[in-house]
Amino acid sequence: MIVIPRYTIIKEKASFRIQEILDNLNLKNPLVITGKNTQKYNKDFDFIYYDEIETSDLENIKNYANDYDSVIGIGGGRPIDIGKLIAHKSKKPFLSVPTTASNDGIASPIVSLTQPSYMTEAPIAIIADIDIIKKSPKKLLSAGMGDIVSNITAVLDWELGKIEKSEKYSDSSGIFSKTIAIELMDYVLNSNLEEYPKKLVKALIGSGISIAIAHSSRPASGSEHLFSHALDTMKEKYSIDTNSLHGEQCGVGTLATAQIYLEEGKLEVETFEMLKTSLKVVDAPVTAKQLGFDEEIVIEALSSAHALRNRHTILRNGISKEKAREILEKSEII
């Protein structure tokens, strides 16, 4: 059964309607998962700071919600992911109240606390207060664009899996995911960006719903996400000091893997330029240097990314470091 949000509010002062949505859902006693900087948006409900929760004990994490009829996540990615996981394990409804828009986890059924990610259910309601979100750091909003453009290569990878590995594919989910990305790129390339935070939130929610439709991260996560995860591995392996975000890394990864599709004749030059320019317009990184990585690190990441997950992508069984360098140079990432 496909589970998608029953209520989606994306507007100014939306956070003042949390109680209204709870009433509409006949929910009376929610537990809020939030952070110290976002607790101020909580409307007097019981709360736990997300960094006080032990997430490694998946079986007992449900106990946090024992005395409550629902769970609300208020904040960025981690409070929402932890809230989603507690709600799933305790079989309670989950409401997502994002305070920024850096990735589609605000609406998807995916919990990304571990790798591989964990499938739960999409939020029953998403309440996105644009007054709050537009005040979040520009870096986070730029990262959101990176997460959305990655849908283009993710869907191409999914289609490739269908062709080369007879993988199950959902036309409705794939088309929906790709259209969301194209519409947001069209907007940022042809406007003054005044409505960018609201347009971005709508796109991220749509992307999350495409995942719920497919019951898989496939429509929004492909080779570009593998590249991002590989960079995370490099950070830890080499103790690299960089504050690059998931969405930023996915944006650069999209350019790298789109270059491979371009060389195989499976992507138009115009689409590649659209991807790159839309990232630049919102000041998202498009080079390794902007992410804070040396050339050799991104080369190693691209050549090893295929091994991080059993998922067929344009990386197939891997590419050599020489080929990785060539791709990264042609796409002007290095």
UniProtKB/Swiss-Prot annotation:
GO terms for molecular function: glycerol-1-phosphate dehydrogenase (NAD+) activity; glycerol-1-phosphate dehydrogenase (NADP+) activity; metal ion binding. It catalyses: sn-glycerol 1-phosphate + NAD(+) = dihydroxyacetone phosphate + NADH + H(+); sn-glycerol 1-phosphate + NADP(+) = dihydroxyacetone phosphate + NADPH + H(+). It is an enzyme of class 1 (oxidoreductase). Its cofactor is Zn(2+). Its EC number is 1.1.1.261. NAD(+) binds at residues 77-81, 99-102, 108. Catalyzes the NAD(P)H-dependent reduction of dihydroxyacetonephosphate (DHAP or glycerone phosphate) to glycerol 1-phosphate (G1P). The G1P thus generated is used as the glycerophosphate backbone of phospholipids in the cellular membranes of Archaea. This is Glycerol-1-phosphate dehydrogenase [NAD(P)+]. It comes from Methanococcus maripaludis (strain DSM 14266 / JCM 13030 / NBRC 101832 / S2 / LL).
